[in-house]
Amino acid sequence: MRLLRVAAALGRGPFPRVPAVLGWQGKQADWKTRRWCSSGPVPNEKIRNIGISAHIDSGKTTLTERVLYYTGRIATMHEVKGKDGVGAVMDSMELERQRGITIQSAATYTMWKDININIIDTPGHVDFTIEVERALRVLDGAVLVLCAVGGVQCQTMTVSRQMKRYNVPFLTFINKLDRMGSNPSRALQQMRSKLNHNAAFVQIPIGLEGDFKGIIDLIEERAIYFDGDFGQIVRYDEIPAGLRAAAADHRQELIECVANSDEQLGELFLEEKIPSVSDLKRAIRRATLSRSFTPVFLGSALKNKGVQPLLDAVLEYLPNPSEVQNYAILNQNDSKEKTKILMNPQRDDSHPFVGLAFKLEAGRFGQLTYVRNYQGELKKGSTIYNTRTGKKVRVQRLVRMHADMMEDVEEVYAGDICALFGIDCASGDTFTNKDNSDLSMESIHVPEPVISIAMRPSNKNDLEKFSKGIGRFTREDPTFKVHFDPESKETIVSGMGELHLEIYAQRMEREYGCPCITGKPKVAFRETIVAPVPFDFTHKKQSGGAGQFGKVIGVLEPLPPEDYTKLEFSDETFGSNVPKQFVPAVEKGFLDACEKGPLSGHKLSGLRFVLQDGAHHMVDSNEISFIRAGEGALKQALANGTLCIIEPIMSVEVIAPNEFQGTVFAGINRRHGVITGQDGIEDYFTLYADVPLNNMFGYSTELRSCTEGKGEYTMEYCRYQPCSPSTQEELINKYLEATGQLPVKKGKAKN
């Protein structure tokens, strides 16, 4: 009766009778006996670890809600944005239910046709990209959700790149076929042209928009309808007469696409043999696992159509943990070379435990650490070691998560995703059960923040709550960074976008009772040089007794545009003019001096400091002497060189009705955007442009007003490039006024 207790806790009453065709046969109490930790370890073949990723508002959370309902995990379906006063199960944070967007990756597990499925529902908003990175790093397969109207959008391309980085096989689900203007064929064409995927339909729709009735399975050659109040009764029928020719054409196209990427099916195709259903399914599985083919499924999660066949496809075509190769890196102190060790996916204790902490969360249950187990067994009460810190910790409680609810388990094995309590660690740490292990899993790619704001508590008495909240948020999210500005005496928080930082300000008030005042957003401008500059600097200080002496000679070089965010140091000295023990001190001086540029006070970046020669004194030279010499050399080079200010450029995608095309183009041009492309379907157009982030503030309000609320846009960080002369002059004058080197113009409003 565990499930009834869970349902009661959710306030949703007992479960309805779910038909056997859904794959969850038997009585309600059967769930308890078929849980994850039933009797002994579940074999790898009966496990799938999947993520659901997509562009914002493509219907990821709605799809997950339907999956949980059809698999018997929840009793009642609820909608995103809490239209029914409840909100989706996977949106457990109050802010998520209010806004109707997913902010954190919610983890859950369920069961379909005797197969255990771990599901991570990820955010679609580009400001929360780190959550998607974390999810894909630890998953074996994924479902990429596309909107049938929007097709391949800005964040879809980002997610596709992330899947490629972590080599994640995936299926595609084109959602929202019931929406006006839905065009799955266009979405498929965009997958081929924009994402370079070898993709083909595995299903085609029976009707579109308001006439969407069901789907045709091209492999089994049959029509599928979804009857009942909630689409829970799956009914199979013959293909409608009017669609038989189209189904035959699409089936032939599917076979050709798969044959191009699978050798075995390719041979059958060349021999002009007709592949059987099982031949085709096996070929699709092989091609999907090798990422050479993407099967495309169709449906409407909101209208309860197409979800059960997608679940069948997850079992049929996505890999189990034993079919994915995961490597750990052996860090050897005496060698710069890193040895890769293949993890063993056997679900027993015959190999040492290795796990990766991929997400931290502090909620009402205390500190939670999400861990993916890559090898061996982890038991409740056992001792594990953090390979980064060398500290040992005891596993006091081991749980599986279902959104913000949890279920205690005694042990987990390779391939499982679980959560631990009371573990002190950082995101990306590796755990083993051997204290001398130097293993570490490959770290998760963390993008650099692009926007900063000043944040302080409204009430000075809330400083303790404020610091506690900031500490928790920085541990949870590596893209949320905090520093104290000694000049303005303000706490500056940095993140991936306005929404990202706004969410944290609201969480501070809701979760810690600490309302915050935020300043105007500040763009992460940087300063760099445009040409190499030589330097020859001597630092001397003599004030009685031992003095200071350090001389450095070399050149300061600009880095190529793709490395504008980096700082590099190169030691090209020969002999002992600059003793090797003082070279790190020169580097430290260079890096310290890069914290503030001479033009506008922003950080310096895109520089390479090449140390070629120098001199030292037997008595007076020490570490501090060469730190000062490194600082002085940089300042000397900057004084003699030509500097410029660089700014972040965003890739912007605007979608609006055709009647507002001229207005939208004019708005982007006014913000100094460079239009890179254009697309259109029916009454809507899509505009692609590169626009400076500094010019994008307030654009959402402008777009809403000039398109009567019908336009929408997304943007993501693209690159750094030199800003316009007018922007550079404005930033320099603002800095000179702030430092008192230039009188403030009369009548100018102070910020």
Curated annotation (Swiss-Prot):
Subcellular localization, as worded in the UniProt entry: Mitochondrion
GO cellular component: mitochondrion
Catalyses which reaction(s): GTP + H2O = GDP + phosphate + H(+)
Keyword Cell cycle: no
Family the entry assigns: Belongs to the TRAFAC class translation factor GTPase superfamily. Classic translation factor GTPase family. EF-G/EF-2 subfamily.
GO biological process, one term: mitochondrial translational elongation
Involved pathway(s): Protein biosynthesis; polypeptide chain elongation
Main function: Mitochondrial GTPase that catalyzes the GTP-dependent ribosomal translocation step during translation elongation. During this step, the ribosome changes from the pre-translocational (PRE) to the post-translocational (POST) state as the newly formed A-site-bound peptidyl-tRNA and P-site-bound deacylated tRNA move to the P and E sites, respectively. Catalyzes the coordinated movement of the two tRNA molecules, the mRNA and conformational changes in the ribosome. Does not mediate the disassembly of ribosomes from messenger RNA at the termination of mitochondrial protein biosynthesis.
Transit peptide feature, positions: 1-37
First-level EC class: hydrolase
InterPro entries per UniProt: EFG_II, EFG_III, EFG_III/V, EFG_IV, EFG_V, EFG_V-like, EFTu-like_2, G_TR_CS
Modified-residue entries (N6-acetyllysine), positions: K176
Modified residues (Phosphoserine): S92
NCBIfam families for the chain: EF-G (TIGR00484), PRK12740.1-5 (NF009381), small_GTP (TIGR00231)
Transmembrane regions listed in the UniProt entry: none
The protein, known as: Elongation factor G, mitochondrial
Residue intervals of the tr-type G domain: 45-322
UniProt lineage: Eukaryota, Metazoa, Chordata, Craniata, Vertebrata
EC code: 3.6.5.-
